[in-house]
A protein has these predicted regions:
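Conserved donor-binding/catalytic core segment of Leloir-type glycosyltransferases
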Residues: 86-105, 111-116
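A charged, aromatic-enriched C-terminal amphipathic alpha-helix characteristic of glycosyltransferases
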Residues: 228-262
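Acidic donor-binding loop of glycosyltransferase active sites
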Residues: 162-177, 190
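Nucleotide-activated donor-binding/catalytic signature segment of Leloir-type glycosyltransferases, i.e.
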Residues: 135-155
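Acidic anion/phosphate-binding donor-loop and adjacent secondary structure
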Residues: 33-36, 69-92
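Membrane-proximal helix-turn-helix segments that form the acceptor-binding/catalytic region
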Residues: 31-53
């Protein structure tokens, strides 16, 4: 982090006019640190003489609302595309999670909710990228079949999404912000439970206002009880939302914003 922030501050001080210095912000970094010094350093970056572009409109506190535009992060829809159908595999329902080491990602909290489900019959848990051994053992002790997938490419990640009937893409901070696992799993034709965009921008019955263990448990049970027509309607609604996040469209939006800013 030290070298990242050092480079960042040096860049801000380069003898280039402010109109040509931009800061594309995908997260409010202050939330990611417990150490007060790192929080302070991260917070100072938002006061640098840079033109701020956000990937979600409500990403920063109001004191930093001097951004010049909002450009959502893009999704490669040639890679993240829907599976042929939302059929159950051998009578089982697969639930997927992108596991992360960072505590604010909420992986352990999600696993706690899964372990507390009353009806665990026929559920397979698929976890990609990161899984602590203690959490794996908790899932096994609860009676789940658990599969772990180390992901090394976007193609593998997209395949992972498509292998699941349900994706849980929730976190503990920045409710409503753009979230790659949420967007990518929506594009891949999964039922998605999330407190992040793009799902929170829809009328989905599976969107959450914030992380809440009880609400998450209710959403999982709702997924498990949807009929085929309800599943299809939810999935098609998710897929239709993703068109505006296609890389081509996002790239054109970003380019137009930069051209206007330099006039």
């Amino acid at each position: 982090f030290f070298f990242f922030f050092l480079f960042f501050f040096l860049f801000a001080l380069l003898p280039i006019t402010r109109r040509k210095k931009y800061y594309f912000i995908q997260a409010y970094e202050v939330n990611f640190f417990d150490n007060i010094i790192w929080k302070l350093i991260a917070g100072l970056t938002y006061y640098l003489p840079l033109k701020k572009i956000l990937n979600s409109p409500n990403l920063l506190p109001h004191k930093h609302d001097d951004f010049i535009g909002v450009v959502p992060a893009g999704v490669d829809l040639n890679v993240f595309y829907p599976k042929p159908s939302n059929r159950l595999l051998n009578g089982h329902t697969s639930i997927g999670i992108i596991g992360r080491k960072e505590k604010h990602k909420g992986t352990s909290e999600i696993i706690s909710v899964l372990c507390s489900l009353e009806n665990k019959a026929g559920i397979i848990i698929n976890i990609a990228i990161y899984l602590e051994e203690v959490d794996k053992q908790r899932l096994i002790a609860a009676g789940f079949q658990v599969n772990f997938f180390p992901i090394t490419s976007d193609l593998e990640l997209a395949s992972f999404y498509r292998s699941n009937d349900i994706m849980i893409a929730v976190g503990l901070i920045e409710d409503g912000a753009f979230h790659y696992p949420c967007a990518e799993s929506m594009a891949c034709g999964c039922l998605v439970i999330s407190n992040y965009a793009p799902l929170t921008e829809t009328n989905s019955v599976l969107k959450l206002v914030k992380f809440d263990a009880c609400k998450l448990g209710e959403a999982i049970n709702l997924c498990l009880n949807l009929d085929l027509e309800e599943k299809s309607k939810e999935i098609q609604s998710n897929i239709s939302v993703l068109n505006k996040y296609d890389w081509k469209i996002v790239g054109e939006t970003f380019n137009s914003l930069l051209l206007d800013a330099n006039k």
